């Protein structure tokens, strides 16, 4: 016999037990099968330092839905999990712990001992996010869990670095890079976030060396002027072109610098003359190369002014700015100051201002790599969903700069380069060298810098599959992966780099589709952040409402590429949906006497209606899933379960379930159970826990719902005529119920309905449903053109019928109209009070936003009530 479900669904008790059952039976394992098509996903590896946040929860849910869907469709499915070593984030975390607990810095320990601490920290805390992901129900193959600094990934990183270096695609050189003085490391262009900040334009007078006058420049960064080695003007600028070739005096430093002509200068911006600081501005650097200007760096790694800054040496860059502006003013060089808002580069990690400065770093030469990465997207080999992100990606790749890959950290993949102490030659080797390949010297010093974290992440789709072992069975079966699910905020950080790395190392795209999702924002549309204190812990939501409710909340209404707002109230609504499914399933089981589900040959009208509806749902949901329209699919499943199955079909079958005819009872049970099981399959990828728990209690074939066959559209369940017929009956019953409710007619009061319709057959078949669901004492069906005595009757119209109800005998119209008038007057009085508040500008300005929004919502409710009362009164006056 079938199991009995408890009266109340308790997700906290069910979820951990179900997940353990799946794990114990290797349900998540990806197994190569030559008879099956492969479907593979590699998880964007969360930081090993991390805790699950709403972005992770959405990301994991989307990937899990796709993986479960494909697994049920019969694909060999593999979802590879893993974590990222997260260079800066992890090092900062461990350094902070070291400082707080022991009062030490990493330098006190030394590199080797410090790295031992980081590995120990990783072993202690690194599994935390994995356990949190499991609570979300993710069906990863945990036996394949990877780490971006594990042995396999480290081997792939070293092989890639050496290959690119040997091809001339990695080089070391001095260029302008983004430097974070707080994290004390270089950053790539993608790691710089630009923030609009208020600032100033300072107009400074540079005297001409020949004493014939001066040239005025405008700058937002006077603190770099000690490193000025020229002033540039546009050669087409009539105001300045006579000065080209002359020299001027750098104020404060009293150094002669040349005036050069370059079209980089924008006529009309500021004064038209621009100070050139090649060591601290990428554009100035390029101008400097064209005019052979000296490069003088004045800002040190820690953001202070260095020895080239004269008397400002040792000052913080912004303290220097204040002091310098004061000195310029006192010495008569400051012409004027204007407020000016401009974009300032900030570090994506610590959000401090980034300093552009000249530095010797390691770079990846991007132009040759970008060509193939652009081609595979342009020709459709890789598709972006939504398609609009294709343009975002192409625009970035077409304008990409060389990638700065060296970081001044200890935690990470140490660059495999050794400097010869004798001749200075750089030895880049797959295995640690013992002597210089150029001069044979035995004394080599290893590069101290590590690689950008994203360098190892860029190899993730193939390093997790066994590369650089090209004979790897995993690599040959699962690569390229099927889809990459990620947020639009890391298209440049990660997606682009995976694409060019895959094309360069594998000569094949790393994935076929890039499925982009947006950010999860708070209910006001703000980005969740610690500073705002508006973050919502997904684990708290899962604990309170169940992981299924959280997952469904994140998916319903979510559309690819768009940000979504998270409403806690919606979690509660989704928990109610779980309860609705649970209670419906309990009802079905309480009425089950069958041990095996088989659809009867003879189907009733309501059976054909629900089977036809289900058939359409299967086709549409499958199409939506294939098109990555997961939010649309989930909404359709929700509507079908709540409206069609629970609110209607269960009610429509109750006459048969209570019948004295055993065959009628069994037929109803079979259809109820069949539709429930097929619907649970459709819902399973979205709500895996509750669906598995219910399915296990129902008559079923196979061991697990998650491994069962995905429903398929079946022509034999197309019943368009019956579906339309049943729909007309449902529409009529709905309209009758609404009118009875408006007129306060108790459900217990039976009414004789007269139905005037051209569709007599449908309504005749539906008479039993009117009796049960519309409190009908009797139903008379007449042709649409038949004469009707409407005296004392209320008319309800639908698209297929006119329905007459003799409610005069049931309702005291005079008394009911008086009640309605009184209720309406009270509602109008309340509405007037609220509208007075909302028209008061003082209230709108001073009251909290939540209070104002609450007042607006109350006003809308009262307007709706007044409209409903008017409709009820009008119906009685007909």
Where are these regions (language model features)?
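Structured ligand/cofactor/substrate-binding pocket environments in proteins
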Residues: 55-67, 83-84, 153-156, 214-329, ...
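Short Cys/His-rich metal-coordination motifs, predominantly Zn2+-binding knuckles/fingers
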Residues: 183, 253, 350, 421-423, ...
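Feature 926 captures the class I aminoacyl-tRNA synthetase adenylation module centered on the KMSKS loop
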Residues: 203, 395-455, 459, 504-547, ...
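Active-site-adjacent bridging/hinge elements
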Residues: 35-43, 65, 101-105, 130-137, ...
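Short acidic, Pro/Gly- and aromatic-enriched capping/linker segments at domain boundaries
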Residues: 329-349, 433, 437-449
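Catalytic cores of large soluble enzymes that bind and process phosphate-bearing ligands
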Residues: 6, 10, 14, 54-58, ...
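Short, polar/flexible loop-turn hinges at active-site or ligand-entry regions and domain interfaces
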Residues: 100-116, 383-384, 539, 560-572, ...
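N-terminal, positively charged nucleic-acid-binding surface of large information/translation enzymes
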Residues: 2-236, 260, 277-290, 294-309, ...
């Amino acid at each position: 016999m079938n199991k009995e479900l408890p009266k109340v669904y308790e997700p906290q008790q069910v979820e951990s037990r179900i997940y353990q059952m799946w794990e114990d039976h290797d349900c998540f394992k990806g197994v190569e099968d030559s008879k099956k098509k492969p479907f593979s996903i590699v998880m964007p590896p969360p930081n090993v330092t991390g805790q699950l946040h709403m972005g992770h929860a959405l990301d994991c849910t989307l990937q899990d839905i796709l993986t479960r869907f494909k697994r049920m469709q019969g694909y060999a499915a593999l979802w590879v999990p893993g974590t990222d070593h997260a260079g800066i984030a992890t090092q900062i975390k461990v350094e902070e712990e070291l400082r707080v607990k022991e009062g030490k810095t990493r330098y006190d320990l030394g590199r080797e001992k410090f790295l031992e601490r980081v590995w120990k920290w990783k072993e202690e805390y690194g599994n935390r996010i994995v356990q949190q992901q499991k609570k979300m129900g993710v069906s990863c193959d945990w036996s394949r869990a990877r780490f971006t600094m594990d042995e396999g990934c480290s081997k792939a990183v070293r092989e890639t670095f050496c290959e690119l270096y040997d091809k001339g695609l990695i080089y070391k050189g001095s260029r302008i890079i983004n430097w974070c003085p707080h994290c004390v490391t270089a950053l790539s262009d993608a790691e710089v976030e630009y923030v609009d900040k208020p600032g100033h334009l300072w107009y400074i007078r540079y005297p001409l060396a020949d004493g014939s006058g001066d040239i005025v420049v405008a700058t937002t960064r006077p603190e770099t002027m000690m490193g000025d080695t020229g002033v540039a003007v546009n050669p087409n600028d009539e105001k300045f072109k006579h000065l080209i070739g002359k020299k001027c005096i750098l104020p404060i430093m009293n150094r002669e610098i040349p005036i050069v002509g370059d079209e980089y200068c924008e006529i009309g911006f500021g004064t038209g003359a621009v100070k050139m600081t090649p060591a601290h501005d990428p554009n100035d650097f390029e101008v400097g190369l064209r005019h052979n200007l000296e490069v003088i760096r004045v800002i040190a790694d820690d953001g202070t002014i260095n020895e080239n800054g004269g008397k400002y040496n040792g000052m913080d860059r912004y303290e220097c700015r204040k002091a310098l502006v004061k000195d310029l003013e006192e010495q008569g060089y400051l012409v004027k100051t204007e407020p000016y808002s401009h974009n300032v580069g900030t570090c994506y990690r610590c959000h401090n201002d980034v300093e552009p400065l000249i530095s010797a770093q390691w770079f990846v030469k991007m132009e040759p790599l970008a060509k193939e990465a652009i081609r595979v997207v342009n020709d459709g080999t890789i598709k972006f969903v939504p398609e609009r992100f294709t343009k975002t990606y192409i625009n970035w790749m077409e304008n990409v700069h060389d990638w700065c890959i060296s970081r001044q950290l200890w935690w990470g993949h140490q660059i495999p380069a050794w400097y010869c102490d004798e001749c200075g030659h750089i030895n880049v080797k797959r295995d640690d060298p013992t002597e210089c390949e150029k001069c044979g010297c035995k004394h080599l010093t290893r590069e101290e810098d590590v690689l950008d974290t994203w360098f190892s992440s860029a190899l993730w789709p193939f390093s997790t599959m066994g590369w650089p072992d090209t004979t790897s069975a995993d690599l040959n079966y699962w690569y390229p992966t099927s889809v990459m699910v990620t947020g639009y905020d890391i298209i440049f950080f990660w997606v682009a780099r995976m694409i060019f790395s895959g094309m360069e190392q594998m000569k094949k795209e790393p994935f076929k589709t890039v499925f982009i999702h947006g950010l999860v924002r708070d209910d006001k549309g703000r980005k969740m952040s610690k500073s705002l204190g508006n973050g919502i812990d997904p684990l708290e939501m899962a604990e309170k409402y169940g992981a299924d409710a959280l997952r469904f909340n994140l998916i319903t209404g979510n559309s690819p590429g768009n940000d979504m707002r998270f409403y806690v109230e919606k979690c509660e609504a989704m928990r109610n949906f779980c309860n609705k499914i649970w209670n419906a399933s309990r009802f079905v089981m309480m009425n089950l006497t069958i041990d095996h589900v088989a659809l009867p040959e003879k189907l009733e009208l309501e059976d054909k209606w629900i089977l036809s509806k289900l058939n359409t749902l299967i086709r549409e949901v499958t199409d939506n899933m294939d098109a990555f329209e997961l939010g649309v699919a989930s909404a359709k499943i929700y509507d079908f379960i709540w409206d069609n199955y629970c609110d209607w079909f269960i009610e429509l079958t109750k006459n048969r379930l209570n019948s004295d005819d055993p065959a009628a009872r069994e037929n109803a049970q079979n259809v109820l159970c069949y539709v429930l099981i097929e619907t649970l399959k459709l819902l399973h990828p979205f709500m895996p826990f509750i669906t598995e728990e219910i399915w296990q209690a129902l008559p079923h074939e196979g061991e697990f719902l998650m491994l069962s066959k995905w429903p398929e559209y079946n022509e034999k369940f197309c019943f368009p005529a019956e579906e339309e017929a049943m729909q007309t009956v449902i529409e009529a019953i709905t309209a009758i119920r609404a009118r009875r409710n408006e007129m306060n007619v108790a459900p217990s009061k039976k009414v004789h309905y007269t139905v005037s319709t051209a569709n007599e057959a449908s309504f005749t078949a539906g008479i039993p449903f009117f009796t049960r669901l519309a409190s009908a004492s009797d139903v008379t069906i007449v042709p649409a053109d038949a004469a009707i005595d409407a005296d004392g009757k209320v008319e309800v119209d639908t698209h297929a019928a006119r329905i007459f109800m003799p409610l005069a005998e049931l309702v005291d119209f005079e008394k009911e109209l008086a009640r309605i008038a009184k209720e309406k007057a009270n509602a109008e009085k309340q509405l007037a009070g609220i509208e007075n508040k909302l028209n008061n500008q003082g209230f709108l300005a001073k009251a909290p936003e939540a209070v104002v929004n609450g007042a607006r919502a109350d006003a809308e409710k009262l307007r709706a009530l007044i409209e409903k009362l008017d409709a009820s009164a009008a119906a009685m006056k007909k």
